[in-house]
A protein has these predicted regions:
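C-terminal catalytic subdomain
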Residues: 54-76, 80-153
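"…together with the soluble PPM/PP2C metallo-phosphatase catalytic core" -> "…together
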Residues: 1-69, 144-150
């Protein structure tokens, strides 16, 4: 994602299962959607050991999104979005935003929540909901790398 303050917009490219939420007035007003070939199978651009490409079909989503003052942009890896429901992210952003905390504090708190949830075995998470939809019995979080960036426009 690239934020252009002169044009009041954000340009995004999305492939795979990382994601972006645009939160305005305590609501998600825009978001990316995971690009997957099936459950737990995100689209990837990669090379084999011999240098030949695997699935290089250009299927990325390209978007240009208008921004307003006070918008909160949350960019996260699947470690965030597999372990924390969107409503929880919005709630945390609202609580932290109302408390005048920095973007870094917001990102740190979201990473901490995702990490705690990833270790739980008795929790309903976005990951466990998707697993069930795919016909798999799974409960709890999904241990994974967790990366979060937050920008207040």
């Amino acid at each position: 994602a690239v934020v252009d303050r002169r044009q009041n917009c954000m340009e995004t490219v999305n492939i795979g299962d990382s994601g972006i939420l645009l939160i305005r007035d305590d609501q998600v007003v825009w978001q990316t959607h995971p690009k997957q070939t099936g459950f737990n199978a995100p689209l990837q651009l990669s090379l084999q050991m011999d240098g030949s490409a695997i699935d290089v079909t250009p299927r990325a989503d390209l978007c240009n999104v208008e921004l307003c003052k006070g918008d909160v942009i949350v960019v996260g890896s699947d470690g965030l979005f597999d372990n924390v429901f969107q409503e929880e992210i919005v709630g945390m952003v609202k609580t932290i935003h109302d408390g005048n905390r920095s973007e870094q504090h917001m990102a740190d708190d979201l990473v901490s929540l995702a990490y705690r949830n990833s270790l739980q075995s008795d929790l309903t998470t976005p990951w466990s909901v998707e697993a069930e939809r795919a016909g798999r019995s799974y409960r709890g979080g999904k241990p994974d790398d967790i990366t979060v960036l937050v920008c207040i426009y």
